[in-house]
Amino acid sequence: MSAIVDIIGREILDSRGNPTVECDVLLESGTMGRAAVPSGASTGSREAIELRDGEAGRYNGKGVLKAVEHINTEISEAIMGLDASEQAFLDKTLLELDGTDNKSRLGANAMLAVSMAVAKAAAEEAGLPLYRYFGGSGAMQLPVPMMNIVNGGAHANNSLDIQEFMIVPVSQPTFREALRCGAEVFHALKKILSDRGMSTAVGDEGGFAPNFGSNDECLSTILQAIEKAGYRAGEDVLLALDCAASEFYHDGKYQLAGEGLQLSSAEFTDYLATLADKFPIVSIEDGMHESDWEGWKLLTDRLGKKVQLVGDDLFVTNTRILKEGIEKGIANSILIKINQIGTLTETFAAIEMAKRAGYTAVISHRSGETEDSTIADIAVGLNAGQIKTGSLSRSDRISKYNQLLRIEEDLGDIASYPGKSAFYNLR
């Protein structure tokens, strides 16, 4: 038995300089697991609640000492002595202790830190890499990365309304080569922007944040960067968008302030369809407001056979909401953010439900990250096939890519890179 003998919660800082929660779990054998939780900027209204202190004079109210206290007191008391290898039972214990639908009492940040740290301790105790502990002998597929090389919206201070413009390397035989492709396109884009006298400062997720005149201009420039790096757009590298449409939906209209447009759901569907016809876009995330299910249905009926339509704010990694979406034919993919739901067990259930329905599951970081690379192990362990973890800069993003390189090396000849086949929802 891998008995838990000590739990320590602490307040640390994330990549934006805001407090977040870290937890150490110590087992009877002396083995320790450590985990830190991320935090989002554009958040869905139905996400599990991250507990903040609200004390204006300290970290502008964003402190997490209350969440840390919960870990060090009642959570510690509830799980002390439990077997760390019994993840489902441990997470169930946390859920019952919290007693709310949205984890607002203990805080999803406190609960997730403990859930992750326990899993890492148990993996270490078992002598297994974390991805192998999660997935067993079937874990051998590396994920296709969606690399955010231009930031807009809530992730940057510029005129772009769409939040993320991503490249997706798909023709490469290995993850290592896919990562090299992404890095080379990233540096080619930097040179293009610099030559034009445009800003090469980066946003929260490590992508560039220049002031383009339109989304069209941004996408055209990315195509130039792909070509400049020696790759073929539409063959070697595809494009992906995260609209984060809930952020610019006001008074029943999609208000693209950067382009001076106010569009209905049908008009915004047309707008996105035009972009998908003009550019090799394989994936669009949050193409409609999280509550605009009629708009989502329009978008899915229009583009769902040729473009991956990912629900982030729409589904918030919640099986109850995902089940409703599947039944209504809304979207064809779910974004998986571990802190949207708050425990590993619930996260894995959402991935499994998506796969059973023929939806893809894209494992994702948050805009406020740490050096914790657990999501890389989840992506491989659960054979998710896709990961979204930022650009090719900032160590909080690179840490996940580097962990995937290590995993691929560890897997050796049995490692596989799915490329275009990761988008099985479009077959």
UniProtKB/Swiss-Prot annotation:
Enzymatic class: lyase
Cofactor binding note from Swiss-Prot or TrEMBL: Binds a second Mg(2+) ion via substrate during catalysis.
Chief localization: cytoplasm
Active site: E205, K337
Binding site for (2R)-2-phosphoglycerate: Q163, K337, R366, S367, K388
Keyword vocabulary terms for this entry: Cytoplasm, Glycolysis, Lyase, Magnesium, Metal-binding, Secreted
Cofactor: Mg(2+)
Pfam family of the protein (one): Enolase_C
Protein residues bound to Mg(2+): D242, E285, D312
Any one of the GO BP annotations: glycolytic process
One term under GO cellular component: extracellular region
Reaction catalyzed: (2R)-2-phosphoglycerate = phosphoenolpyruvate + H2O
Pathway involvement of the protein, from the record: Carbohydrate degradation; glycolysis; pyruvate from D-glyceraldehyde 3-phosphate: step 4/5
E.C. number(s) listed in UniProt: 4.2.1.11
GO molecular function: magnesium ion binding; phosphopyruvate hydratase activity
Compartment(s): Cytoplasm; Secreted; Cell surface
PANTHER family linked: ENOLASE
Similarity annotation: Belongs to the enolase family.
The protein's role, per its UniProt record: Catalyzes the reversible conversion of 2-phosphoglycerate (2-PG) into phosphoenolpyruvate (PEP). It is essential for the degradation of carbohydrates via glycolysis.
Protein known as: Enolase
Originating organism: Burkholderia lata (strain ATCC 17760 / DSM 23089 / LMG 22485 / NCIMB 9086 / R18194 / 383)
